[in-house]
Amino acid sequence: ESAMQGFVTTHSHEVVRNSRISQLRVLRQVKPFECCLYDLHRFIDEVIKPNQELKDLIEFYDGFYAINFPDIIFADKVILYEGDTERMLIKNALLSERFEALRNQYISFVQVGGAYAINYKPILDYLNIKSLIITDLDFYADAETESDVVQSLSTNATINAFAKEALKESEPSVQVLYSWKDNMKHVAIKNICLAFQGINDHYARTLEEAMLAKRYNMSALDTKTREEWTSLRKNDKLKFVIPQKVDS
């Protein structure tokens, strides 16, 4: 048997996908002409395995590893988002002159639900990648008044996990989350910025609700008949789903 050891440098996604995560060492630029080596074998052995709360992530990483892991480790920055609405919003926002510098960087876009975005935090922290998570506040759907909303809780695991770390509250009320977002220029922990609906988004649970509420200058808690929504949609030539009537 040969005792030879060696290494291969690559930018190939396929090479990365066909290697074990513990075999990877990532070189990332930290300053002009200066790189830092990130050892993913140590990441698994020293960050994930010793932490009882993170041990289940080993199976998760094995699953997402073959999908978008290469996009993350090669990226300058990462944007994690929930669905098609966020994707289209990001795509159009990046066309603005304001974000010209971002267009010249390698940004990885990862579609992931609010329940799972938190799973990416350890690897993003370890690789020190500046990241943005766009997710929905998702307070309980039975909250029908402003008072109900501010007393409600978020069902979003990612928001709750960030709040637990930053605010030391495992189940913060929506009012607490509103204040957290309102009192900071950016809700961020280390290198990760977290974006969700705030008090200025008209009590919306989701990005779609916030956009419609702003468009029609209304609260997301306001009600309209199906006919009124149909008329608005037709007049504005927009495409959005109007819920069917609920049988009593």
Give residue ranges: language-model regions.
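Conserved catalytic segment of ABC-fold P-loop ATPases
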Residues: 18-26
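Loop/turn-to-beta-strand initiation segments
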Residues: 2-7, 130
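Short, structured coil segments at secondary-structure junctions
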Residues: 2, 19-20, 127
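H-loop/switch region of ABC-family ATPase nucleotide-binding domains
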Residues: 9-11
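Acidic, divalent-metal-binding catalytic cores of TOPRIM
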Residues: 16, 29-248
